A protein has these predicted regions:
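Membrane-interface anchoring determinants
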Residues: 1-8, 22-26, 30, 34-116, ...
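Positions in alpha-helical segments
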Residues: 7-11, 23, 311, 347
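A short, ordered amphipathic alpha-helix with a cationic face
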Residues: 11-14, 188
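Short alpha-helix boundary/capping elements
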Residues: 13, 17, 32-34, 332
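A general boundary/transition motif marking the beginning of the first structured unit of a protein
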Residues: 13, 26, 52-56, 316, ...
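A residue-level detector for the "anchor" residue at the start of short, highly conserved motifs
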Residues: 68, 72-85, 95-386
Length: 386
């Protein structure tokens, strides 16, 4: 009985396999269990692949370390840098592996899809709107922005606002193809993903709860503790749930088109409420709230995968192509069409960078499909999957 061996895979990837060995490998990896073994081997033998591609192992290592240092400089959340490092290496593994195969290229009729960037619209209490974007600064009596984040002017930060002061709200809207950071008056940091909108007060009132509302979309919260704010509790509301926070880090995903609102706790403790139902979450747990009921399900999750977007990454683990395309459509501001239901069910696992072009992302996904079962065609800002 013919078996799939490491040496056969190595020969193939190093382009040393003869015609008979290539035919043998193709036959073996057509079997489901061997196909999985083949993928696992290539992912865990990255340095070997680098030597095949570059014929210089030390140079390959240096390239990885340089890439890691670049990511480290970009990353705001120190606690999760190690995950970004690992993900960067995984992405390079994919590139090294998939370039070995000969597949049909993604068809592009017109290149008009651009990578997402820092941009948002600030709606002031009087209805005026301010465009915030990379390379453009803004400042008024209350706020200032460097084009990447919106912060309160230092002179306007105050923990002693009168309890009888009227609460005035602003809105920050991040369009499709964008992301933006918001630093609230109490020191809480919020990172908004594409196609998201948050309602927040200009000032929190002394002795009252600190409340914000995620109207739709996805946001990561790093909440300033109650101890630093005269014991005031922090509350985040969505259309279906309310989250009570003491001081913690968590992610909420609540897009209008989704039937499930997910809340993932990274650090601390939060209480999730949906009608009369409520649960307490511990780190590495996620709540799922059905928008059509009062049920709250709790499960353990891989935190890195759930918050990979804040590190500039896409992380997919046996994710359906339908869900992947939904994620990509928000970041690249595009539309997509499936020619049949079968393509929607295709599963993909991998960690990719959000700074890559849509063509690069689709290339990787396409190359993981056996027998060319997935093909993409780009027409203007529409991706057709067949």
């Amino acid at each position: 009985m013919i078996k799939l061996t490491d040496s056969l895979i190595v020969k193939y990837l190093s382009k040393e396999a003869n015609l008979f060995e290539k035919e043998e490998l193709n036959y073996l990896i057509s079997k489901k269990k061997n196909h999985k073994l083949f993928k696992n081997f290539t992912y865990t033998n990255y340095l070997s692949l680098m030597s095949f591609n570059n014929h210089d192992l030390d140079k390959g290592k240096r390239n990885i370390y340089n890439r890691i240092r670049l990511i480290e400089k970009r990353n705001k959340l120190e606690r999760y840098k190690k995950y970004a490092f690992a993900a960067s290496v995984i992405f390079l593994i994919g590139i090294s592996l998939f370039n070995q195969f000969n597949f049909n290229e993604t068809k592009i009729t017109k290149e008009s899809i651009i990578i997402g960037s820092d941009k948002a619209v600030l709606t002031l209490e009087n209805g005026d709107q301010v465009i915030l974007e990379k390379g453009k600064t803004f400042q008024n009596k209350t706020f200032n922005s460097n084009g990447k984040e919106l912060s309160y002017s230092i002179k306007n930060r105050s923990a002693n606002n009168p309890s009888n002061q009227k609460i005035v709200y602003n809105f920050l809207t991040v369009p499709r193809g964008g992301q933006f950071s918001l630093n609230l008056e109490d020191g809480t940091e919020v990172l908004l993903n594409s196609d998201s909108k948050i309602k927040f007060p200009i000032k929190f009132i002394k002795g009252k709860k600190r409340e914000v509302e995620l109207l739709y979309g996805e946001a990561f919260f790093d909440v300033s503790t109650s101890q630093n704010n005269n014991g005031s509790e922090f509350i985040v509301s969505t259309k279906t749930q309310k989250i009570n926070v003491i001081g913690t880090k968590f992610n909420i995903k609540a897009y209008d088109e989704d039937d499930i609102v997910t809340t993932t706790l990274v650090e601390g403790k939060i209480k999730v409420q949906n009608g009369e139902s409520q649960v307490l979450l511990s780190p590495n747990q996620q709540s799922k709230v059905d928008t059509k009921s009062t049920n709250i399900d709790v499960l353990n999750v891989d935190v890195f995968q759930e918050i990979s977007w804040i590190n500039g990454l896409f992380s997919f683990n046996d994710t359906s192509l339908e869900n992947i395309m939904q994620t990509l459509s928000r970041w690249y501001d595009l539309k997509f069409i499936f020619k049949s239901v079968n393509e929607k069910k295709f599963l993909f696992s991998g960690v990719l960078e959000r700074t890559k072009s849509i063509e690069d992302i689709l290339f990787i996904i396409e190359k993981t499909s056996s027998l060319n079962e997935i093909n993409f065609e780009i027409i203007d800002k529409v991706i057709i999957i067949e």
